[in-house]
Amino acid sequence: MLFKNTLAYYNFSITYTQDYKNTPRLNTRVLHPSCKITSSLKKTQYLKSKVKHKMFFCTNMYSPQLNHVLQLVFDCNHIVPNSYQEITLKCRISSTKPGILFITDGTESETEDVLFDVQFLENTMTIKIKILPISRTVPVRIHLFSIPIYLPSPALEIDDINALCQKENIDPIVYEQYGLTNMPISTTNVINQFKVVSNDSVETSLILLNLSWTESPYQSQKLDRYGRKLLIVFSVFSIDTRKCSYWKNLFKSMIPLCRVNMISEPGISIYKIEFNDPFLTIFLRNVVLPENERRFPITKECYLRLTFSPPNRSTVTLNMNMPYFKICADGKSLEVFFPSDMSLVINTNKEITLRGKFTNKKIVGIFIPVQTHVFKLYPFLWFAQEPLKLRISCEKTVSVTEHDMLGRIFFVTKKLFRKPFRSLSNSDMKSLLTHTENTDKPFEVHFMGNCFPAYLLPELTLHPLEYEDKPARGNPQILPSVEKHSIIKMRI
């Protein structure tokens, strides 16, 4: 047989609310794996109920080798019968690989029994699992599994000291006309020279002649230090990479990273670079004073020196540089914001399409919305070469700005998520484990409209909780911890 039954015991901290004043807590001591301790949760004198409620906690870990998926089976009625109150479970967990930990609902019901949550798991960390306040006629099942992620990396790395910190919007019409074509796009004369500066990098020197500048009506107003209005214009040109004999061997179908080494004109900076094989499309930006062009003339010539290198294979390169996309501070995910200030009307579904894409077809993005009561937005899968389409609903009319975040995007391998998925409610984020005996893939995970073997996931481990100090005296709202043990069964 591939499986055998064993018992192990771990520490969990259980918190549930009897009323708004009294919050009893259960903390178990560190238990040896060979121990077996059974007890009941005793009510304190602050609680009205004098009945002892037994707690039963069972974890099932499915894998012929180690633990790839954790299943926690929790019978809430053993603590509070017919409870309509939220329960919080706390445990320590670790993974063999850094990734995103999914806390999913595995209960066989049509309602959302467990609050869906996503956390970045690295090393050993303490997580909280919330069981929602509903009538629980069956034991609640909680599925925990981790998926390795690809770190997002911008297609353009700007090292230009003249680059503006705030990016302006490019005219959508001009963007569609110029930014998404595979043909040379302007009359600008480009004299370029490629050379290999290292084993995996190519440096190009560009002399641009006859530059044509266009004003965008979709730009924010900027003033110089004297209060004079500045005009921002841009120019677009392309480079044919087939003229570089090293390009195809070094980068193949990958989108390279670009470093701006030098720009001859102080007022010019690079707004965006796109790579649509075999053409590199470069957007230049210039800042001028329209009422005094003689003093600040718009230059027709420019000299650039750029270095291209292949991206890190553990990252997914983003072919976008839009204001509403931002790589988060920890570099683990991509933050998505509203594209502009807008109003969301009550009981109306609004669809927002954000320009920008990534081209690595082996990667898929998982959109996780922010938790807010202002608008409703549900998780979905974002595939390569597709625009990001968001469907938002609101229970009341609200106004949002371009500084309001919509959610985060984590990038994972497409081996696990091959089919499109877009949830319509929180209950769509449930997960299911199926077992097939006498096969090489005994357990499969059904999640977000896809099915994948559990053994492809990193191994998870539960750890004992450290002893929690009792709260300081003088705080009437927090009761002392109730130190008792509970049955925790693990079946492998």
From Swiss-Prot:
<protein>
    <recommendedName>
        <fullName>Uncharacterized protein U55</fullName>
    </recommendedName>
</protein>
<dbReference type="Pfam" id="PF06501">
    <property type="entry name" value="Herpes_U55"/>
</dbReference>
<dbReference type="InterPro" id="IPR009479">
    <property type="entry name" value="Herpes_U55"/>
</dbReference>
